[in-house]
C-alpha cells in the first residue's frame, strides 16, 4: 500500500500543478477559500468521490450533466461538477497560487449569465458562501434542481453586501481603512436616484429569465404613453367642441349661460404640448428680464422722455448728487481731452434737452445684438412698463416702401393712436436690417418731419410749411423701437446717425442657468447645474435655443438632463453668422480652459499638429479647437475678407517661434488658398471651394495664444488697389497729353520703370530767383529746354490753396507718386518763385505754339485768294510778293474797296448749265435810274472787310475786329 501511494504521489502533484490556477479562481468565486485549505476541496455527501483511475480515464474533461430545456445552465453546471465530482488530491506540499494566470483569464461570459435584472453588465460580485444554502447539498437534489433552487434563493443585488474583504476582479472599487487598521473594499455602483451623468448600462431592461429587452423603453411605459396621448386627444377635441359652441352663442346668452367647463384637464396634463415653453415662460414684468440691467434702464429712460408729448406729463427734475457731481466736474477739469465711454455717452444723450417739439433728440431706438438674447421681449416688456400698447411689425415682410409707409403711419398717425385699454401705441419694428434702403429712407423721412416751432426757428413760411406737412403727414408723436441682428448692414448707416444705438450684450450664464432650472423644476424635469451650464455654452447663451432644447428633450420622454445628453443632442444649434472681428478673435485667441489639460504635449511644435499622425490622445483638445474654427469660418461666408484680415494681422501677434517656421508655414497656406481660388474660378472647379475654410483653422493652430490680439480691419489690399488705380490714371493722363513724337517712343511700362524716375531730376534745375532778363544765355537755354521737355511730356505746375490759406504749385499730373517710394528721402524741391516762373513760361510757350499753328493752317487759304490779316494783293489781282501789313491809319474804307475784287458766280440750272437770261428793253417812260456802281461795290466790300458794323436792336457793342495774340506780345 505504501508503494502504491509512493507511485501515486507524483501523479497527484502533476494533477495539482495542472489545475492549480483554475481551482484557485473557482475557490475564490464560489467563496470556499475561507472554509478549506488551498490544496483541498470539499465533496458533498450525496456523491461518492471518484477513484484515481476514474480521474485518469476522464482526463481534463469532467462529466457535466445538463437538463433538457435549460441551455443557459451549462456553464454553471460546469463549475458545480468541477467542484463536486473531482476528487481532492492529497499532497503533502501546499503549492503557491499562480495569480498571474488568474489575471489573464476572462470570466465575463460566465459571469454575465449570473447578472440580475437590476445589476449592470460586468457585475461579478461573489455570491454568498455555500454554507447559506445547506439544503442544496443534500443527496436528494439533482444538479438541475440545485440550479433552480440556487437562482430562486440567491439574494437580489441591492441586498448583497457591497463591503468586501478582498478587492473584486472585474468591478471598480475604493479601499477604506477603519480606525483599527482593517481595510475593506467598497464596490462602486451607479446611483439610480440622485442627479448626475446617466449610465447607459442602466437603461438595459430585463425580460423573463435572463433575456434582454430589445426596446429602449419598457412596453408598459409605451402603453402608458399611448393611453395618455389618447386621453389628451379626447380632451383637446372636447375643448375644441366647447369653444365652437361658445362662439355660436350671443354675448348676452354667453354671460347668462356661462358656467364651469365640461371637462378640464388635470393640472399636470402636459400643457407644454399645446404651446412653446418660450411663450409660456416669457417675461411679463420688468423684474423678470434676463438682459443687461444697463440696457434695460437706458431703453426705459428713452421711453420716459416721450411722456410730455404722449401723456402730457412734465419731465421730473433730476435730484443733484453733490458727491458725484463734484467728482465728475473734477475729473472733467483734470482730464478735458479724455475719451468718454459708451455708457457715459449714452447717459449724456439721455440727459440732453428735448427738441423744440418737446421730443427727444433721437426719435428712434435701435436694439442690436445676436438672435436669441431677448431683444423683442425687452422692447415689449419695457414698452408695456412705460404705459404703451405695443404694435409690432416685421420689416422683412413689408419690404416695399409704400407698404412700409402705410404700416408706420397706421400705427402712429392715420388710425387712432390709442390702443387696447386707451393706451398710446408704441411701434416695434423687428428685423429692420432686412428692409431695403428705400424703406429705411421712408422711415427717415417720417423721423425728419419738423413741427411748427422748428419751422419758425428755421425761418420758413408757416403757411407753406403747414401745407407741406399736411401733404406729407403729421409730426411723429409716438416712439419707435427698431430691432436688428447686424448693425453694420449698409442700409442702416443713415438710421444709426439719428437713432439711440443700444447694443444688447450676451446674457449672463448664472442668470440663464437659474431661469432654466426654474423651468425644469416646474415641469418635473431633473437637471443638475453642470448640464445646464453645458447647454448654455453649447448655444452661446441663447435663451430661446436653451428653452427649446429643454422642451424637445422633455417631449422625447427624457425626465433627467445630463451632460452626456446635452453633448450628444444636436438640437439647439443655430446657423448664426458671426462678424468678421469675432471670427478673427476666435482664430487668434485660445478659448478659456475650464479644467486642467490632460495628455497635451506642450513641447510639441505647432505645425506638427497639422502634419503629424501621432498620438490621438495628445491632440484631442487641438482637434476640437480645429473643428470649431472650421465650423465658425464656414458659417462666416466672407472668406476673402477673413483671409485678408488674417494676412494683415498675423505678423502683429506675439510669435513664439524664433526660427519663423510658423510664418513660412502660414505663407504656404496663403499660397495654397490663392491656388485654390484660381483653380476654382478659372477652371470652373467649384468643388475645390470646400477646402478654403481650412486656412483659418490652420492659422488658429499656428498662432493662437491666450493673449488678447489687437486686430485691425484689413486695409492693405484696398490701399494697394487705390494706389494702383491712381497710378494708372496718372500714366493714362500723361500719355494722352504727350506730343505724338514723344508718345511713339514712350510706352507706359517704359515710363514707369525707366523714364519718370530720371525725368524728375531733369525737371528740377538750379534756377536763380531773379527776372529772366537777368539770366545769362546758358540759363535762358536751360529754361527753354526745361519748358520744351515739360511740354513734350504734357507736364505743368498748377497753383493750389492749402486748408491753412497758403498757395503751392504742384506738378500736374503728379508723376512723383508713380515712381517714388514714400520711405525714400525726397529730393530738394524747387522754390515757389521758380515754379511760378516755369509755369508762366509754359503758358507763354503754349500760346506761341497755338498761334503759330493757327497761322500755319491759315497760310494755304491766303494763297488761294482769301483776305487774311497778313495777305496783301497787288492792284492787278495777280498773286505777288507778300508785303507787310498796312498801318492802322492807312486802313480806310476806300482802300479796302479798291483792293476788294467782286466775283459773281453765274446762275446755273439743275444740270449745272449756265442760264442765260434775256434782258428786256424797258421803255423810256418806265425806265428807273440805274444804281450807282460805286455804292454797290462799297456794300460788297464792307461785307468782306476786317472791320464791319452791324446794327442790332438793343445792342450797342456791335463793332468787331479780329485780334491776334502776336499783336499783343
Swiss-Prot record:
<dbReference type="GO" id="GO:0051985">
    <property type="term" value="P:negative regulation of chromosome segregation"/>
</dbReference>
<keyword id="KW-0547">Nucleotide-binding</keyword>
<dbReference type="GO" id="GO:1900264">
    <property type="term" value="P:positive regulation of DNA-directed DNA polymerase activity"/>
</dbReference>
<comment type="function">
    <text>Chromosome cohesion factor involved in sister chromatid cohesion and fidelity of chromosome transmission. Component of one of the cell nuclear antigen loader complexes, CTF18-replication factor C (CTF18-RFC), which consists of CTF18, CTF8, DCC1, RFC2, RFC3, RFC4 and RFC5. The CTF18-RFC complex binds to single-stranded and primed DNAs and has weak ATPase activity that is stimulated by the presence of primed DNA, replication protein A (RPA) and by proliferating cell nuclear antigen (PCNA). The CTF18-RFC complex catalyzes the ATP-dependent loading of PCNA onto primed and gapped DNA.</text>
</comment>
<dbReference type="GO" id="GO:0005634">
    <property type="term" value="C:nucleus"/>
</dbReference>
<dbReference type="InterPro" id="IPR047854">
    <property type="entry name" value="RFC_lid"/>
</dbReference>
<keyword id="KW-0067">ATP-binding</keyword>
<dbReference type="InterPro" id="IPR003593">
    <property type="entry name" value="AAA+_ATPase"/>
</dbReference>
<feature type="region of interest" description="Disordered">
    <location>
        <begin position="856"/>
        <end position="889"/>
    </location>
</feature>
<dbReference type="GO" id="GO:0007059">
    <property type="term" value="P:chromosome segregation"/>
</dbReference>
<dbReference type="GO" id="GO:0003677">
    <property type="term" value="F:DNA binding"/>
</dbReference>
<feature type="compositionally biased region" description="Low complexity">
    <location>
        <begin position="257"/>
        <end position="268"/>
    </location>
</feature>
<protein>
    <recommendedName>
        <fullName>Chromosome transmission fidelity protein 18 homolog</fullName>
    </recommendedName>
</protein>
<dbReference type="GO" id="GO:0005524">
    <property type="term" value="F:ATP binding"/>
</dbReference>
<feature type="modified residue" description="Phosphothreonine">
    <location>
        <position position="51"/>
    </location>
</feature>
<dbReference type="Pfam" id="PF00004">
    <property type="entry name" value="AAA"/>
</dbReference>
<dbReference type="GO" id="GO:0001673">
    <property type="term" value="C:male germ cell nucleus"/>
</dbReference>
<keyword id="KW-0597">Phosphoprotein</keyword>
<dbReference type="InterPro" id="IPR053016">
    <property type="entry name" value="CTF18-RFC_complex"/>
</dbReference>
<dbReference type="GO" id="GO:0031390">
    <property type="term" value="C:Ctf18 RFC-like complex"/>
</dbReference>
<keyword id="KW-0131">Cell cycle</keyword>
<feature type="compositionally biased region" description="Basic and acidic residues">
    <location>
        <begin position="876"/>
        <end position="889"/>
    </location>
</feature>
<feature type="modified residue" description="Phosphoserine">
    <location>
        <position position="221"/>
    </location>
</feature>
<dbReference type="GO" id="GO:0006260">
    <property type="term" value="P:DNA replication"/>
</dbReference>
<dbReference type="GO" id="GO:0007281">
    <property type="term" value="P:germ cell development"/>
</dbReference>
<comment type="subunit">
    <text>Component of the CTF18-RFC complex, which consists of CTF18, CTF8, DCC1, RFC2, RFC3, RFC4 and RFC5. During assembly of the CTF18-RFC complex, CTF18 may first assemble into a subcomplex with RFC2, RFC3, RFC4 and RFC5. CTF18 then interacts directly with CTF8, which in turn interacts with DCC1. The CTF18-RFC complex associates with PCNA and with DNA polymerase POLH. The CTF18-RFC complex does not interact with the Rad9/Rad1/Hus1 complex. CTF18 interacts with SMC1A and RAD21. Interacts with DDX11.</text>
</comment>
<dbReference type="GO" id="GO:0016887">
    <property type="term" value="F:ATP hydrolysis activity"/>
</dbReference>
<dbReference type="GO" id="GO:0005737">
    <property type="term" value="C:cytoplasm"/>
</dbReference>
<feature type="binding site">
    <location>
        <begin position="369"/>
        <end position="376"/>
    </location>
    <ligand>
        <name>ATP</name>
    </ligand>
</feature>
<keyword id="KW-0539">Nucleus</keyword>
<feature type="region of interest" description="Disordered">
    <location>
        <begin position="318"/>
        <end position="340"/>
    </location>
</feature>
<keyword id="KW-0238">DNA-binding</keyword>
<feature type="region of interest" description="Disordered">
    <location>
        <begin position="30"/>
        <end position="97"/>
    </location>
</feature>
<keyword id="KW-0235">DNA replication</keyword>
<dbReference type="GO" id="GO:0007140">
    <property type="term" value="P:male meiotic nuclear division"/>
</dbReference>
<feature type="region of interest" description="Disordered">
    <location>
        <begin position="250"/>
        <end position="269"/>
    </location>
</feature>
<dbReference type="InterPro" id="IPR027417">
    <property type="entry name" value="P-loop_NTPase"/>
</dbReference>
<dbReference type="InterPro" id="IPR003959">
    <property type="entry name" value="ATPase_AAA_core"/>
</dbReference>
<dbReference type="GO" id="GO:0007131">
    <property type="term" value="P:reciprocal meiotic recombination"/>
</dbReference>
<comment type="similarity">
    <text>Belongs to the activator 1 small subunits family. CTF18 subfamily.</text>
</comment>
Amino acid at each position: 500500500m505504501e508503494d502504491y501511494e509512493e507511485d501515486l504521489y507524483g501523479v497527484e502533484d502533476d494533477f495539482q500543478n495542472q489545475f492549480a490556477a483554475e481551482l484557485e479562481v473557482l475557490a475564490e468565486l464560489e467563496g470556499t477559500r475561507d472554509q478549506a485549505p488551498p490544496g483541498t476541496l470539499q465533496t458533498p455527501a450525496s456523491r461518492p468521490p471518484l477513484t484515481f483511475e476514474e480521474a485518469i480515464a476522464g482526463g481534463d474533461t469532467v462529466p457535466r450533466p445538463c437538463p433538457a430545456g435549460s441551455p443557459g445552465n451549462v456553464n454553471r453546471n460546469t463549475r458545480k461538477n468541477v467542484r463536486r465530482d473531482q476528487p481532492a488530491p492529497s499532497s503533502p506540499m501546499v503549492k503557491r497560487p499562480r495569480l498571474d494566470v488568474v489575471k489573464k483569464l476572462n470570466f465575463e461570459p460566465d459571469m454575465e449569465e449570473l447578472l440580475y435584472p437590476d445589476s449592470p453588465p460586468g457585475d461579478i460580485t461573489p455570491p454568498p458562501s455555500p454554507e447559506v444554502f445547506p439544503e442544496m447539498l443534500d443527496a436528494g437534489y439533482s444538479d438541475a434542481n440545485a440550479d433552480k433552487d440556487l437562482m430562486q434563493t440567491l439574494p437580489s443585488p441591492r441586498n448583497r453586501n457591497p463591503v468586501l474583504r478582498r478587492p473584486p476582479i472585474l468591478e471598480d472599487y475604493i479601499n477604506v481603512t477603519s480606525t483599527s487598521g482593517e481595510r475593506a473594499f467598497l464596490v462602486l455602483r451607479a446611483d439610480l436616484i440622485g442627479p448626475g451623468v446617466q449610465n447607459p448600462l442602466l437603461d438595459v431592461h430585463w425580460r423573463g429569465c435572463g433575456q434582454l429587452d430589445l426596446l429602449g423603453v419598457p412596453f408598459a411605459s409605451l402603453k402608458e404613453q399611448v393611453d395618455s396621448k389618447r386621453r389628451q386627444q379626447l380632451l383637446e377635441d372636447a375643448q375644441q367642441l366647447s369653444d365652437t359652441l361658445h362662439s355660436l352663442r350671443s354675448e348676452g346668452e354667453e354671460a347668462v349661460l356661462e358656467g364651469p367647463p365640461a371637462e378640464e384637464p388635470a393640472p399636470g396634463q402636459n400643457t407644454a404640448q399645446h404651446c412653446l415653453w418660450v411663450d409660456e415662460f416669457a417675461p411679463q414684468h420688468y423684474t423678470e428680464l434676463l438682459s443687461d440691467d444697463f440696457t434695460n434702464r437706458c431703453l426705459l429712460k428713452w421711453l420716459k422722455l416721450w411722456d410730455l408729448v404722449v401723456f402730457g406729463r412734465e419731465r421730473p427734475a433730476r435730484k443733484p448728487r453733490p458727491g458725484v457731481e463734484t467728482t465728475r466736474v473734477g475729473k472733467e477739469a483734470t482730464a478735458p481731452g479724455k475719451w468718454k465711454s459708451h455708457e457715459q455717452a449714452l447717459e449724456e444723450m439721455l440727459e440732453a434737452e428735448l427738441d423744440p417739439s418737446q421730443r427727444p433728440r433721437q426719435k428712434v431706438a435701435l436694439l442690436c445684438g445676436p438672435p436669441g438674447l431677448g431683444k423683442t421681449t425687452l422692447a415689449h416688456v419695457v414698452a408695456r412698463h412705460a404705459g404703451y400698447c405695443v404694435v409690432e411689425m416685421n420689416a422683412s415682410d413689408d419690404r416695399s416702401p409704400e407698404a412700409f409707409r402705410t404700416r408706420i403711419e397706421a400705427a402712429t398717425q392715420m388710425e387712432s393712436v390709442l390702443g387696447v385699454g386707451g393706451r398710446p401705441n408704441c411701434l416695434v419694428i423687428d428685423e429692420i436690417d432686412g428692409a431695403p434702403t428705400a424703406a429705411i429712407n421712408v422711415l427717415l423721412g417720417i423721423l425728419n418731419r419738423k413741427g411748427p416751432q422748428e419751422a419758425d426757428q428755421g425761418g420758413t413760411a408757416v403757411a407753406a410749411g403747414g401745407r407741406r406737412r399736411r401733404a406729407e403727414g403729421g409730426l411723429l408723436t409716438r416712439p419707435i423701437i427698431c430691432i436688428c441682428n447686424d448693425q453694420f448692414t449698409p442700409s442702416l448707416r443713415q438710421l444709426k446717425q439719428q437713432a439711440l444705438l443700444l447694443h444688447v450684450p450676451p446674457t449672463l450664464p448664472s442668470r440663464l442657468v437659474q431661469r432654466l432650472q426654474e423651468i425644469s423644476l416646474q415641469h418635473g424635469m431633473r437637471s443638475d447645474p453642470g448640464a445646464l451650464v453645458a447647454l448654455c455654452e453649447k448655444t452661446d447663451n441663447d435663451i430661446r435655443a436653451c428653452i427649446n432644447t429643454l422642451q424637445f428633450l422633455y417631449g422625447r420622454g427624457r425626465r433627467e438632463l445630463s451632460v452626456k445628453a446635452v453633448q450628444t443632442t444636436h438640437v439647439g444649434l443655430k446657423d448664426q453668422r458671426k462678424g468678421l472681428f469675432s471670427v478673427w478673435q476666435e482664430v487668434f485667441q485660445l478659448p478659456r480652459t475650464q479644467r486642467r489639460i490632460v495628455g497635451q504635449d506642450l513641447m510639441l511644435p505647432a505645425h506638427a499638429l497639422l502634419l503629424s499622425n501621432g498620438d490621438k490622445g495628445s491632440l484631442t483638445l487641438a482637434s476640437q479647437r480645429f473643428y470649431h474654427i472650421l465650423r465658425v469660418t464656414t458659417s462666416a461666408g466672407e472668406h476673402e475678407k477673413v483671409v485678408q484680415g488674417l494676412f494683415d494681422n498675423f505678423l502683429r501677434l506675439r510669435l513664439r517661434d524664433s526660427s519663423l517656421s510658423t510664418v513660412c508655414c502660414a505663407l504656404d497656406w496663403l499660397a495654397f488658398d490663392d491656388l485654390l481660388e484660381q483653380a476654382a474660378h478659372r477652371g470652373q472647379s467649384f468643388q475645390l471651394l470646400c477646402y478654403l475654410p481650412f486656412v483659418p483653422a490652420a492659422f488658429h493652430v499656428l498662432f493662437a495664444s491666450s493673449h488678447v490680439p489687437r486686430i485691425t480691419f484689413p486695409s492693405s489690399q484696398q490701399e494697394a488697389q487705390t494706389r494702383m488705380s491712381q497710378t494708372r490714371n496718372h500714366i493714362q493722363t500723361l500719355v494722352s497729353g504727350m506730343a505724338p513724337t514723344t508718345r511713339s517712343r514712350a510706352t507706359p511700362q517704359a515710363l514707369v520703370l525707366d523714364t519718370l524716375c530720371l525725368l524728375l531730376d531733369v525737371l528740377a534745375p538750379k534756377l536763380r530767383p531773379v527776372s529772366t532778363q537777368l539770366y545769362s544765355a546758358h540759363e535762358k537755354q536751360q529754361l527753354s529746354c526745361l519748358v520744351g521737355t515739360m511740354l513734350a511730356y504734357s507736364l505743368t505746375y498748377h497753383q493750389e490753396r492749402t486748408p491753412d490759406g497758403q498757395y503751392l504749385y504742384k506738378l500736374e499730373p503728379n508723376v512723383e507718386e508713380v515712381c517714388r517710394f514714400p520711405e525714400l528721402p525726397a529730393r530738394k524741391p524747387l522754390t515757389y518763385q521758380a515754379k511760378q516762373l516755369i509755369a508762366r513760361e509754359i503758358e507763354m510757350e503754349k500760346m506761341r505754339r497755338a498761334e503759330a499753328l493757327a497761322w500755319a493752317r491759315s497760310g494755304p487759304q491766303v494763297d488761294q485768294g482769301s483776305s487774311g490779316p497778313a495777305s496783301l494783293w497787288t492792284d492787278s489781282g495777280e498773286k505777288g510778293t507778300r508785303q507787310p501789313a498796312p498801318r492802322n491809319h492807312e486802313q480806310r474804307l476806300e482802300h479796302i474797296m479798291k483792293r476788294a475784287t467782286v466775283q459773281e458766280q453765274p446762275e446755273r440750272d439743275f444740270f449745272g448749265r449756265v442760264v442765260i437770261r434775256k434782258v428786256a428793253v424797258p421803255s423810256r417812260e418806265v425806265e428807273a435810274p440805274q444804281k450807282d456802281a460805286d455804292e454797290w461795290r462799297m456794300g460788297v466790300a464792307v461785307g468782306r472787310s476786317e472791320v464791319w458794323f452791324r446794327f442790332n436792336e438793343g445792342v450797342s457793342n456791335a463793332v468787331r475786329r479780329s485780334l491776334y495774340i502776336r499783336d499783343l506780345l
